[in-house]
Amino acid sequence: MAGLLSTFDTFSSRRSESINKSGGGAVIPGQRSTVSVFVLGPSVTDDADKLFIATTFLAHSLDTDKQHSQRGGFLVSLLAMAYSSPELYLTTNGVNADVKYVIYNIEKDPKRTKTDGFIVKTRDMEYERTTEWLFGPMVNKSPLFQGQRDAADPDTLLQTYGYPACLGAIIVQVWIVLVKAITSSAGLRKGFFNRLEAFRQDGTVKGALVFTGETVEGIGSVMRSQQSLVSLMVETLVTMNTARSDLTTLEKNIQIVGNYIRDAGLASFMNTIKYGVETKMAALTLSNLRPDINKLRSLIDTYLSKGPRAPFICILKDPVHGEFAPGNYPALWSYAMGVAVVQNKAMQQYVTGRTYLDMEMFLLGQAVAKDAESKISSALEDELGVTDTAKERLRHHLANLSGGDGAYHKPTGGGAIEVALDNADIDLETEAHADQDARGWGGESGERWARQVSGGHFVTLHGAERLEEETNDEDVSDIERRIAMRLAERRQGILQPMEMKAAITVWITTKMTMPQQ
Protein backbone atom coordinates (compact mmCIF):
# COMPACT_ATOMS: atom_id res chain seq x y z
CA MET A 1 0.00 0.00 0.00
CA ALA A 2 2.88 2.34 0.79
CA GLY A 3 4.21 1.89 -2.73
CA LEU A 4 0.82 2.72 -4.20
CA LEU A 5 0.55 5.93 -2.17
CA SER A 6 4.07 6.90 -3.17
CA THR A 7 3.13 6.47 -6.82
CA PHE A 8 0.12 8.74 -6.40
CA ASP A 9 2.19 11.35 -4.58
CA THR A 10 4.73 11.59 -7.39
CA PHE A 11 2.23 11.42 -10.26
CA SER A 12 1.69 15.17 -10.56
CA SER A 13 5.39 16.04 -10.69
CA ARG A 14 6.20 13.23 -13.13
CA ARG A 15 3.26 14.26 -15.32
CA SER A 16 4.42 17.89 -15.44
CA GLU A 17 7.96 16.75 -16.14
CA SER A 18 6.90 14.62 -19.11
CA ILE A 19 4.81 17.45 -20.56
CA ASN A 20 7.48 20.13 -20.22
CA LYS A 21 10.45 18.11 -21.45
CA SER A 22 11.26 18.05 -25.11
CA GLY A 23 10.42 14.89 -26.94
CA GLY A 24 13.15 15.33 -29.54
CA GLY A 25 12.54 15.70 -33.25
CA ALA A 26 13.51 18.36 -35.75
CA VAL A 27 13.73 22.01 -34.66
CA ILE A 28 11.74 24.14 -37.10
CA PRO A 29 12.38 27.88 -36.63
CA GLY A 30 9.42 30.23 -36.74
CA GLN A 31 8.97 33.47 -38.63
CA ARG A 32 10.91 36.43 -37.26
CA SER A 33 10.39 40.11 -37.94
CA THR A 34 13.27 42.50 -38.55
CA VAL A 35 13.75 45.43 -36.18
CA SER A 36 16.19 48.27 -36.87
CA VAL A 37 18.39 49.36 -33.99
CA PHE A 38 20.65 52.42 -34.10
CA VAL A 39 23.88 52.62 -32.10
CA LEU A 40 26.39 55.42 -31.67
CA GLY A 41 29.59 55.16 -33.70
CA PRO A 42 33.04 56.17 -32.42
CA SER A 43 32.82 59.58 -34.12
CA VAL A 44 29.98 60.70 -31.84
CA THR A 45 31.89 61.91 -28.79
CA ASP A 46 30.21 65.13 -27.69
CA ASP A 47 27.91 64.68 -24.70
CA ALA A 48 25.39 67.18 -26.07
CA ASP A 49 25.16 65.15 -29.30
CA LYS A 50 24.65 61.94 -27.32
CA LEU A 51 21.85 63.43 -25.22
CA PHE A 52 20.24 64.84 -28.37
CA ILE A 53 20.27 61.39 -29.98
CA ALA A 54 18.81 59.83 -26.83
CA THR A 55 15.90 62.28 -26.84
CA THR A 56 15.48 61.67 -30.59
CA PHE A 57 15.11 57.94 -29.95
CA LEU A 58 12.57 58.69 -27.23
CA ALA A 59 10.58 60.99 -29.50
CA HIS A 60 10.45 58.38 -32.29
CA SER A 61 9.27 55.73 -29.82
CA LEU A 62 6.23 57.93 -29.11
CA ASP A 63 5.35 58.59 -32.75
CA THR A 64 1.93 57.00 -33.24
CA ASP A 65 2.35 57.18 -37.02
CA LYS A 66 5.03 54.48 -36.82
CA GLN A 67 4.48 50.76 -36.34
CA HIS A 68 4.87 49.43 -32.82
CA SER A 69 7.80 47.28 -33.94
CA GLN A 70 9.62 50.41 -35.13
CA ARG A 71 8.78 52.24 -31.93
CA GLY A 72 10.05 49.26 -29.94
CA GLY A 73 13.27 49.37 -31.94
CA PHE A 74 13.87 52.97 -30.86
CA LEU A 75 13.37 52.00 -27.22
CA VAL A 76 15.91 49.21 -27.69
CA SER A 77 18.29 51.76 -29.23
CA LEU A 78 17.80 53.99 -26.19
CA LEU A 79 18.40 51.16 -23.71
CA ALA A 80 21.55 50.09 -25.57
CA MET A 81 23.06 53.56 -25.07
CA ALA A 82 23.78 52.59 -21.46
CA TYR A 83 26.58 50.28 -22.64
CA SER A 84 29.96 50.95 -24.18
CA SER A 85 29.35 48.10 -26.64
CA PRO A 86 25.69 48.11 -27.72
CA GLU A 87 26.38 45.34 -30.21
CA LEU A 88 27.61 43.04 -27.42
CA TYR A 89 24.61 44.00 -25.29
CA LEU A 90 22.20 42.96 -28.05
CA THR A 91 24.15 39.79 -28.81
CA THR A 92 24.06 38.77 -25.14
CA ASN A 93 20.48 39.70 -24.29
CA GLY A 94 18.67 40.18 -27.59
CA VAL A 95 18.49 36.61 -28.88
CA ASN A 96 14.79 36.19 -29.51
CA ALA A 97 12.59 33.83 -31.50
CA ASP A 98 10.30 36.68 -32.60
CA VAL A 99 12.68 39.34 -33.90
CA LYS A 100 16.01 39.80 -35.57
CA TYR A 101 17.83 43.02 -34.73
CA VAL A 102 19.60 44.79 -37.60
CA ILE A 103 22.16 47.27 -36.30
CA TYR A 104 22.93 50.61 -37.97
CA ASN A 105 25.68 53.00 -36.83
CA ILE A 106 25.19 56.73 -36.35
CA GLU A 107 28.33 58.70 -37.17
CA LYS A 108 29.15 62.41 -37.01
CA ASP A 109 30.64 64.03 -40.14
CA PRO A 110 31.81 67.63 -39.53
CA LYS A 111 31.62 68.32 -43.28
CA ARG A 112 27.89 67.63 -43.44
CA THR A 113 25.67 70.69 -43.18
CA LYS A 114 22.30 68.94 -42.93
CA THR A 115 20.85 66.63 -40.28
CA ASP A 116 23.23 68.26 -37.77
CA GLY A 117 26.13 66.39 -39.36
CA PHE A 118 24.80 62.94 -38.50
CA ILE A 119 24.76 60.08 -40.99
CA VAL A 120 23.38 56.54 -40.69
CA LYS A 121 25.70 53.93 -42.14
CA THR A 122 27.00 50.39 -42.01
CA ARG A 123 30.41 49.09 -42.94
CA ASP A 124 29.48 48.96 -46.60
CA MET A 125 27.27 51.94 -47.30
CA GLU A 126 25.59 55.11 -46.10
CA TYR A 127 21.83 55.50 -45.81
CA GLU A 128 20.86 59.03 -46.75
CA ARG A 129 17.11 58.49 -46.78
CA THR A 130 17.21 56.75 -43.41
CA THR A 131 19.25 59.65 -42.02
CA GLU A 132 16.64 62.14 -43.25
CA TRP A 133 13.90 59.99 -41.76
CA LEU A 134 15.69 59.72 -38.41
CA PHE A 135 16.94 63.29 -37.97
CA GLY A 136 14.44 65.18 -40.09
CA PRO A 137 11.88 67.61 -38.64
CA MET A 138 9.48 66.05 -36.15
CA VAL A 139 6.30 67.43 -34.69
CA ASN A 140 6.01 66.32 -31.08
CA LYS A 141 2.34 66.13 -30.14
CA SER A 142 3.27 66.70 -26.49
CA PRO A 143 6.45 67.48 -24.54
CA LEU A 144 8.69 64.55 -23.67
CA PHE A 145 9.65 65.90 -20.25
CA GLN A 146 7.89 67.99 -17.67
CA GLY A 147 10.86 70.35 -17.72
CA GLN A 148 10.01 71.35 -21.28
CA ARG A 149 6.75 72.79 -19.95
CA ASP A 150 8.70 74.74 -17.36
CA ALA A 151 11.17 76.07 -19.96
CA ALA A 152 14.03 74.15 -18.33
CA ASP A 153 17.18 73.82 -20.41
CA PRO A 154 18.52 70.24 -20.76
CA ASP A 155 21.93 71.67 -21.70
CA THR A 156 22.13 73.27 -18.27
CA LEU A 157 21.42 69.91 -16.68
CA LEU A 158 24.07 68.36 -18.89
CA GLN A 159 26.66 70.87 -17.71
CA THR A 160 25.63 70.51 -14.07
CA TYR A 161 25.17 66.76 -13.69
CA GLY A 162 26.94 65.27 -16.70
CA TYR A 163 25.81 63.00 -19.52
CA PRO A 164 25.74 59.67 -17.60
CA ALA A 165 23.35 61.06 -14.97
CA CYS A 166 21.02 62.58 -17.58
CA LEU A 167 20.96 59.42 -19.69
CA GLY A 168 20.48 57.34 -16.56
CA ALA A 169 17.47 59.42 -15.54
CA ILE A 170 15.80 58.72 -18.89
CA ILE A 171 16.58 54.99 -18.95
CA VAL A 172 15.53 54.40 -15.33
CA GLN A 173 12.14 55.90 -16.14
CA VAL A 174 11.76 53.56 -19.12
CA TRP A 175 12.34 50.66 -16.73
CA ILE A 176 9.79 52.01 -14.27
CA VAL A 177 7.25 52.17 -17.09
CA LEU A 178 8.01 48.50 -17.79
CA VAL A 179 7.26 47.59 -14.18
CA LYS A 180 3.95 49.42 -14.04
CA ALA A 181 2.86 48.47 -17.59
CA ILE A 182 3.13 44.82 -16.58
CA THR A 183 1.86 44.90 -13.01
CA SER A 184 -0.85 47.59 -13.13
CA SER A 185 -1.54 48.78 -16.65
CA ALA A 186 -4.91 50.26 -15.66
CA GLY A 187 -3.26 52.79 -13.34
CA LEU A 188 -0.06 53.28 -15.31
CA ARG A 189 0.41 57.00 -14.79
CA LYS A 190 -0.35 57.03 -11.08
CA GLY A 191 1.74 53.93 -10.46
CA PHE A 192 4.64 55.35 -12.46
CA PHE A 193 4.84 58.62 -10.56
CA ASN A 194 4.44 56.86 -7.20
CA ARG A 195 7.32 54.53 -8.02
CA LEU A 196 9.40 57.39 -9.42
CA GLU A 197 9.21 59.41 -6.21
CA ALA A 198 12.00 57.47 -4.50
CA PHE A 199 14.33 58.12 -7.44
CA ARG A 200 13.45 61.81 -7.42
CA GLN A 201 14.17 62.10 -3.72
CA ASP A 202 17.62 60.54 -4.00
CA GLY A 203 18.49 62.70 -7.02
CA THR A 204 18.65 59.91 -9.60
CA VAL A 205 15.98 61.59 -11.73
CA LYS A 206 16.09 65.38 -12.00
CA GLY A 207 12.81 67.26 -12.08
CA ALA A 208 13.41 68.71 -15.55
CA LEU A 209 13.84 65.21 -17.01
CA VAL A 210 10.72 63.63 -15.51
CA PHE A 211 8.49 62.12 -18.19
CA THR A 212 5.13 63.68 -18.89
CA GLY A 213 2.03 61.55 -18.48
CA GLU A 214 1.69 61.31 -22.27
CA THR A 215 5.25 59.97 -22.54
CA VAL A 216 4.53 57.33 -19.91
CA GLU A 217 1.36 56.19 -21.68
CA GLY A 218 3.11 56.06 -25.06
CA ILE A 219 5.99 53.92 -23.82
CA GLY A 220 3.58 51.68 -21.91
CA SER A 221 1.49 50.98 -25.02
CA VAL A 222 4.61 49.87 -26.91
CA MET A 223 5.74 47.56 -24.12
CA ARG A 224 2.36 45.89 -23.87
CA SER A 225 2.41 45.08 -27.58
CA GLN A 226 6.09 44.13 -28.02
CA GLN A 227 6.90 40.97 -26.10
CA SER A 228 10.38 40.93 -27.66
CA LEU A 229 11.17 44.25 -25.93
CA VAL A 230 10.00 42.90 -22.58
CA SER A 231 12.08 39.75 -23.11
CA LEU A 232 15.17 41.85 -23.85
CA MET A 233 14.73 43.82 -20.64
CA VAL A 234 14.18 40.68 -18.57
CA GLU A 235 17.29 39.06 -20.06
CA THR A 236 19.16 42.23 -19.12
CA LEU A 237 18.12 41.72 -15.50
CA VAL A 238 19.08 38.04 -15.59
CA THR A 239 22.52 38.89 -16.97
CA MET A 240 23.13 41.56 -14.35
CA ASN A 241 22.00 39.23 -11.55
CA THR A 242 24.09 36.24 -12.59
CA ALA A 243 27.01 37.15 -14.82
CA ARG A 244 28.45 40.39 -13.50
CA SER A 245 29.48 42.04 -10.27
CA ASP A 246 31.08 45.29 -11.55
CA LEU A 247 27.80 47.10 -12.17
CA THR A 248 27.56 50.78 -12.98
CA THR A 249 25.36 53.13 -10.96
CA LEU A 250 22.75 53.02 -13.72
CA GLU A 251 22.76 49.21 -13.73
CA LYS A 252 22.33 49.14 -9.95
CA ASN A 253 19.32 51.44 -10.29
CA ILE A 254 17.94 49.14 -12.98
CA GLN A 255 18.33 46.22 -10.58
CA ILE A 256 16.40 48.13 -7.93
CA VAL A 257 13.56 48.72 -10.37
CA GLY A 258 13.77 45.14 -11.61
CA ASN A 259 13.14 43.80 -8.11
CA TYR A 260 9.56 45.05 -8.39
CA ILE A 261 8.78 42.65 -11.23
CA ARG A 262 10.35 39.59 -9.67
CA ASP A 263 7.66 36.93 -9.28
CA ALA A 264 5.09 39.22 -10.92
CA GLY A 265 1.95 37.18 -11.52
CA LEU A 266 3.00 34.59 -8.92
CA ALA A 267 1.62 36.28 -5.80
CA SER A 268 -0.95 33.55 -5.14
CA PHE A 269 1.68 30.83 -5.50
CA MET A 270 4.13 32.59 -3.18
CA ASN A 271 1.48 33.47 -0.61
CA THR A 272 0.25 29.88 -0.56
CA ILE A 273 3.75 28.71 0.29
CA LYS A 274 4.27 31.47 2.86
CA TYR A 275 0.98 31.24 4.74
CA GLY A 276 -0.18 27.74 3.87
CA VAL A 277 2.98 25.64 4.16
CA GLU A 278 5.73 27.57 5.93
CA THR A 279 3.48 28.23 8.95
CA LYS A 280 3.59 24.42 9.50
CA MET A 281 0.25 24.16 11.27
CA ALA A 282 -1.51 20.88 11.98
CA ALA A 283 -4.21 21.52 9.36
CA LEU A 284 -1.75 20.44 6.67
CA THR A 285 -2.36 16.84 7.72
CA LEU A 286 -5.93 16.93 6.39
CA SER A 287 -6.50 14.41 3.63
CA ASN A 288 -8.42 16.86 1.41
CA LEU A 289 -5.35 19.11 1.31
CA ARG A 290 -3.01 16.33 0.24
CA PRO A 291 -3.70 16.56 -3.54
CA ASP A 292 -3.08 20.30 -3.50
CA ILE A 293 0.11 19.85 -1.48
CA ASN A 294 1.37 17.39 -4.08
CA LYS A 295 0.47 19.87 -6.82
CA LEU A 296 2.32 22.64 -5.00
CA ARG A 297 5.37 20.40 -4.62
CA SER A 298 5.31 19.77 -8.37
CA LEU A 299 5.06 23.51 -9.08
CA ILE A 300 8.02 24.22 -6.81
CA ASP A 301 10.11 21.72 -8.79
CA THR A 302 8.99 23.37 -12.04
CA TYR A 303 9.82 26.83 -10.69
CA LEU A 304 13.31 25.82 -9.57
CA SER A 305 13.98 24.10 -12.91
CA LYS A 306 13.67 27.48 -14.65
CA GLY A 307 16.82 28.74 -12.98
CA PRO A 308 17.42 32.52 -12.90
CA ARG A 309 14.44 33.13 -15.21
CA ALA A 310 11.98 31.55 -12.77
CA PRO A 311 10.87 34.87 -11.20
CA PHE A 312 9.90 36.13 -14.66
CA ILE A 313 7.98 33.17 -16.11
CA CYS A 314 4.72 35.14 -16.18
CA ILE A 315 6.30 38.22 -17.75
CA LEU A 316 8.05 36.07 -20.35
CA LYS A 317 4.77 34.22 -20.98
CA ASP A 318 6.37 30.85 -20.38
CA PRO A 319 3.84 28.16 -21.36
CA VAL A 320 3.89 26.70 -17.84
CA HIS A 321 2.97 29.92 -16.06
CA GLY A 322 -0.74 29.08 -16.18
CA GLU A 323 -0.10 26.05 -13.97
CA PHE A 324 0.75 28.39 -11.09
CA ALA A 325 -2.76 29.88 -10.96
CA PRO A 326 -4.45 29.24 -7.58
CA GLY A 327 -7.36 27.53 -9.30
CA ASN A 328 -5.05 24.52 -9.70
CA TYR A 329 -4.73 24.11 -5.91
CA PRO A 330 -7.91 25.79 -4.61
CA ALA A 331 -8.26 24.10 -1.22
CA LEU A 332 -4.69 24.81 -0.11
CA TRP A 333 -4.86 28.36 -1.47
CA SER A 334 -8.15 28.99 0.36
CA TYR A 335 -6.67 27.68 3.61
CA ALA A 336 -3.56 29.83 3.14
CA MET A 337 -5.66 32.94 2.51
CA GLY A 338 -7.57 32.26 5.72
CA VAL A 339 -4.30 32.16 7.64
CA ALA A 340 -3.04 35.25 5.79
CA VAL A 341 -5.96 37.55 6.61
CA VAL A 342 -5.44 36.82 10.32
CA GLN A 343 -1.66 37.01 10.46
CA ASN A 344 -1.17 39.95 8.10
CA LYS A 345 -3.63 42.85 8.12
CA ALA A 346 -2.41 43.98 4.70
CA MET A 347 -3.64 40.68 3.27
CA GLN A 348 -7.19 41.63 4.24
CA GLN A 349 -7.17 43.87 1.16
CA TYR A 350 -6.06 40.99 -1.08
CA VAL A 351 -8.70 39.79 -3.54
CA THR A 352 -9.91 36.46 -2.15
CA GLY A 353 -13.46 36.49 -3.52
CA ARG A 354 -12.65 34.12 -6.36
CA THR A 355 -15.07 31.62 -7.85
CA TYR A 356 -12.85 28.73 -6.76
CA LEU A 357 -12.61 29.86 -3.13
CA ASP A 358 -13.23 26.90 -0.80
CA MET A 359 -15.17 28.58 2.00
CA GLU A 360 -14.65 25.73 4.46
CA MET A 361 -10.88 25.86 4.02
CA PHE A 362 -10.91 29.66 4.18
CA LEU A 363 -12.68 29.52 7.55
CA LEU A 364 -10.41 26.73 8.76
CA GLY A 365 -7.34 28.81 7.98
CA GLN A 366 -8.70 31.68 10.03
CA ALA A 367 -9.69 29.42 12.92
CA VAL A 368 -6.27 27.76 13.03
CA ALA A 369 -4.46 31.10 12.82
CA LYS A 370 -6.53 32.49 15.69
CA ASP A 371 -5.75 29.51 17.90
CA ALA A 372 -3.01 30.43 20.37
CA GLU A 373 -1.61 26.88 20.41
CA SER A 374 -1.10 26.93 16.65
CA LYS A 375 0.84 30.18 16.82
CA ILE A 376 3.64 28.58 18.80
CA SER A 377 6.21 26.75 16.70
CA SER A 378 7.21 23.53 18.42
CA ALA A 379 10.14 23.18 16.02
CA LEU A 380 11.85 26.22 17.58
CA GLU A 381 11.05 25.48 21.22
CA ASP A 382 14.09 23.30 21.85
CA GLU A 383 16.39 25.40 19.67
CA LEU A 384 15.53 28.59 21.55
CA GLY A 385 15.38 26.89 24.94
CA VAL A 386 11.85 28.09 25.71
CA THR A 387 10.69 26.98 29.16
CA ASP A 388 7.20 25.72 29.98
CA THR A 389 6.55 28.85 32.03
CA ALA A 390 7.51 31.10 29.14
CA LYS A 391 5.27 29.14 26.79
CA GLU A 392 2.35 29.40 29.19
CA ARG A 393 2.80 33.16 29.54
CA LEU A 394 3.05 33.48 25.77
CA ARG A 395 -0.23 31.57 25.36
CA HIS A 396 -1.82 33.86 27.92
CA HIS A 397 -0.70 37.00 26.06
CA LEU A 398 -1.88 35.63 22.71
CA ALA A 399 -5.26 34.73 24.18
CA ASN A 400 -5.65 38.25 25.57
CA LEU A 401 -4.73 39.83 22.25
CA SER A 402 -7.21 37.78 20.24
CA GLY A 403 -9.86 37.24 22.91
CA GLY A 404 -12.04 40.15 21.83
CA ASP A 405 -11.86 39.40 18.12
CA GLY A 406 -14.13 36.46 17.45
CA ALA A 407 -15.40 37.65 14.07
CA TYR A 408 -14.26 36.01 10.87
CA HIS A 409 -13.06 37.94 7.84
CA LYS A 410 -15.10 37.78 4.67
CA PRO A 411 -13.67 37.30 1.16
CA THR A 412 -13.01 40.60 -0.60
CA GLY A 413 -13.15 41.73 -4.21
CA GLY A 414 -13.40 39.51 -7.24
CA GLY A 415 -16.54 38.39 -9.03
CA ALA A 416 -17.75 36.06 -6.29
CA ILE A 417 -20.53 37.01 -3.89
CA GLU A 418 -19.09 38.58 -0.76
CA VAL A 419 -19.52 36.35 2.27
CA ALA A 420 -19.51 37.55 5.88
CA LEU A 421 -19.43 35.39 8.96
CA ASP A 422 -21.53 35.58 12.09
CA ASN A 423 -20.67 33.61 15.21
CA ALA A 424 -24.25 33.49 16.52
CA ASP A 425 -26.05 30.15 16.47
CA ILE A 426 -29.53 30.46 14.93
CA ASP A 427 -32.29 27.95 15.55
CA LEU A 428 -34.29 27.74 12.34
CA GLU A 429 -37.08 25.83 14.08
CA THR A 430 -38.19 28.55 16.44
CA GLU A 431 -41.81 29.62 16.37
CA ALA A 432 -40.86 33.06 15.07
CA HIS A 433 -39.25 31.51 12.00
CA ALA A 434 -42.10 29.07 11.48
CA ASP A 435 -44.61 31.93 11.39
CA GLN A 436 -42.70 34.06 8.86
CA ASP A 437 -44.87 35.28 6.05
CA ALA A 438 -44.10 35.26 2.35
CA ARG A 439 -41.82 38.26 2.79
CA GLY A 440 -39.53 36.24 5.02
CA TRP A 441 -39.56 38.65 7.96
CA GLY A 442 -40.79 37.84 11.45
CA GLY A 443 -40.64 39.88 14.62
CA GLU A 444 -37.14 39.91 16.07
CA SER A 445 -35.71 37.89 13.20
CA GLY A 446 -36.05 40.89 10.91
CA GLU A 447 -33.20 42.53 12.78
CA ARG A 448 -31.16 39.38 12.30
CA TRP A 449 -31.67 38.99 8.58
CA ALA A 450 -31.35 42.58 7.40
CA ARG A 451 -29.18 45.39 8.57
CA GLN A 452 -28.11 48.81 7.37
CA VAL A 453 -24.37 49.21 6.90
CA SER A 454 -22.50 52.47 6.26
CA GLY A 455 -25.42 54.18 4.63
CA GLY A 456 -25.99 51.31 2.20
CA HIS A 457 -28.58 48.52 2.53
CA PHE A 458 -27.71 44.84 2.38
CA VAL A 459 -30.06 41.89 2.28
CA THR A 460 -28.47 38.94 4.11
CA LEU A 461 -29.22 35.23 4.14
CA HIS A 462 -28.12 32.88 6.95
CA GLY A 463 -26.52 29.61 5.80
CA ALA A 464 -27.44 30.24 2.15
CA GLU A 465 -25.82 28.86 -0.92
CA ARG A 466 -24.89 31.08 -3.85
CA LEU A 467 -27.66 33.34 -5.14
CA GLU A 468 -27.87 35.02 -8.49
CA GLU A 469 -26.60 38.58 -8.37
CA GLU A 470 -29.49 41.02 -8.21
CA THR A 471 -29.74 43.87 -10.71
CA ASN A 472 -31.46 47.20 -10.75
CA ASP A 473 -34.49 45.55 -12.35
CA GLU A 474 -35.09 43.39 -9.25
CA ASP A 475 -37.10 45.09 -6.53
CA VAL A 476 -36.58 44.56 -2.85
CA SER A 477 -39.76 42.54 -2.32
CA ASP A 478 -38.61 39.97 -4.87
CA ILE A 479 -35.31 39.62 -3.03
CA GLU A 480 -37.17 39.04 0.21
CA ARG A 481 -39.39 36.42 -1.44
CA ARG A 482 -36.31 34.51 -2.65
CA ILE A 483 -34.87 34.55 0.84
CA ALA A 484 -38.11 33.23 2.34
CA MET A 485 -38.21 30.37 -0.18
CA ARG A 486 -34.62 29.36 0.62
CA LEU A 487 -35.32 29.43 4.34
CA ALA A 488 -38.43 27.28 3.89
CA GLU A 489 -36.38 24.69 1.97
CA ARG A 490 -33.87 24.45 4.78
CA ARG A 491 -36.58 23.94 7.40
CA GLN A 492 -37.83 21.01 5.32
CA GLY A 493 -34.59 19.14 5.87
CA ILE A 494 -32.00 20.37 3.35
CA LEU A 495 -29.91 21.62 6.27
CA GLN A 496 -30.45 20.36 9.83
CA PRO A 497 -30.62 23.12 12.44
CA MET A 498 -28.08 21.52 14.76
CA GLU A 499 -25.52 21.53 11.97
CA MET A 500 -25.62 25.31 11.68
CA LYS A 501 -22.73 25.93 14.05
CA ALA A 502 -20.82 28.39 11.85
CA ALA A 503 -23.31 30.94 10.57
CA ILE A 504 -22.54 32.06 7.02
CA THR A 505 -24.20 35.21 5.82
CA VAL A 506 -24.26 36.01 2.10
CA TRP A 507 -24.46 39.76 1.61
CA ILE A 508 -26.24 40.66 -1.60
CA THR A 509 -25.54 44.31 -2.30
CA THR A 510 -28.47 46.12 -3.93
CA LYS A 511 -27.98 49.31 -5.85
CA MET A 512 -31.40 50.62 -4.82
CA THR A 513 -32.32 51.99 -1.41
CA MET A 514 -34.28 49.62 0.80
CA PRO A 515 -37.39 51.29 2.33
CA GLN A 516 -37.05 51.98 6.02
CA GLN A 517 -39.10 49.71 8.31
UniProtKB/Swiss-Prot annotation:
Transmembrane segments: none annotated. The keyword Ribonucleoprotein applies. Residues 440-461 are annotated as: Homomultimerization. RNA binds at residues 180, 190, 195, 260, 350, 354. It comes from the Viruses. Pfam families: Paramyxo_ncap. Most abundant protein in the virion. Since the viral RNA genome consists of 15,383 bases,there are 2564 molecules per encapsidated genome. Forms the helical nucleocapsid (NC) in a ratio of 1 N per 6 ribonucleotides, protecting the genome from nucleases. The NC has a helical structure with either 13.07 N per turn, approximately 20 nm in diameter, with a hollow central cavity approximately 5 nm in diameter. The encapsidated genomic RNA serves as template for transcription and replication; encapsidation by N is coupled to RNA synthesis. Forms the encapsidation complex with the phosphoprotein protein P. Before encapsidation, the newly synthesized free N protein, so-called N0, is chaperoned by P. This is Nucleoprotein. The lineage of its organism: Viruses, Riboviria, Orthornavirae, Negarnaviricota, Haploviricotina.
